């Protein structure tokens, strides 16, 4: 399930791409598959990186010297890369988990090349507020969401660091009711019939990608997409 749209974040041959907070690898692997690029995934969780490594094995192209894939465990506040290393940076559904997200944004600005592109996604405010209202446990779990962003304020904070915003969209509207159900039945979510049936629907949709649900979600995303996805260009050095 991709949140980032690679038409809005176009990858060019030879690009070095960072997926910050890559989790189990959905975007860093997708970027590698997308073109002849050098993909790097960073996460604090060694367990998630192991899952990413295992998933990547089915996509590896060891004979293609034009592309590479690497993983590293590191803090978003102290990235182990030199200034101006990356052509593209992805940070999807991560900033809401980081206590000092301003520090993470400064690190992103530091490692991104002048003129490079940055994609950030966070949970959309109003669906997220309903999740918080339905269950305290939703945001109190270890590693859970620490804040609810206002997308316009986050955009302004990123622009303040020297970025220009150039695109925005919303994603995953079909997932919103699923998370509301999980929050409503938090204590019994693993056995709740409604939660299980909706999960089956989402798995079917992801595996089969039928036209009906694709059209439905596309029409719903501007209204209730779970994620807001914003794209920025780092200002070139003067």
Model regions and ranges:
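Residues lining the SAM
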Residues: 92-95, 121
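Conserved catalytic loop of SAM-dependent methyltransferase domains
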Residues: 167-203, 226-227
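A SAM-dependent methyltransferase catalytic signature shared across enzymes that methylate proteins
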Residues: 152-169
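Short, glycine-/aromatic-enriched active-site segment of Class I SAM-dependent methyltransferases
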Residues: 123-147, 155-157
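Alpha/beta-hydrolase-fold catalytic nucleophile elbow
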Residues: 121-122, 171
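A short glycine-rich, Lys/Arg-flanked "PGG" loop and its adjoining helix->strand segment in the class I
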Residues: 102-117
């Amino acid at each position: 399930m991709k949140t980032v749209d690679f038409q809005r974040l176009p990858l060019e041959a030879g690009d070095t791409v960072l997926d910050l907070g890559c989790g189990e690898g959905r975007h860093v692997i997708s970027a590698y598959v997308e073109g002849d690029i050098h993909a790097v995934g960073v996460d604090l969780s060694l367990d998630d990186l192991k899952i990413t490594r295992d998933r990547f094995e089915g996509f590896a192209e060891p004979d293609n010297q034009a592309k590479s894939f690497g993983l590293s465990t590191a803090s978003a506040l102290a990235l182990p890369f030199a200034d101006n290393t990356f052509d593209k940076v992805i940070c999807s559904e991560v900033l809401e988990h980081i206590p000092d997200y301003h520090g993470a944004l400064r690190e992103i600005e530091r490692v991104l090349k002048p003129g490079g592109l940055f994609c950030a996604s966070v949970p959309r405010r109003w669906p997220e507020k309903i999740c918080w209202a339905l269950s305290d446990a939703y945001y109190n779990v270890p590693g859970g969401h620490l804040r609810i962003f206002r997308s316009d304020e986050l955009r302004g904070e990123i622009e303040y660091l020297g970025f220009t915003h150039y695109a925005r969209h919303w994603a995953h509207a079909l997932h919103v009711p699923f998370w509301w159900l999980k929050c409503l039945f938090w204590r019994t979510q693993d056995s709740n019939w409604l939660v299980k049936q909706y999960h089956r629907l989402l798995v079917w949709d992801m595996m089969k990608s039928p036209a009906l649900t694709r059209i439905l979600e596309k029409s719903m995303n501007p209204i209730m997409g779970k994620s807001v996805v914003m794209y920025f260009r780092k200002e070139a050095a003067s």
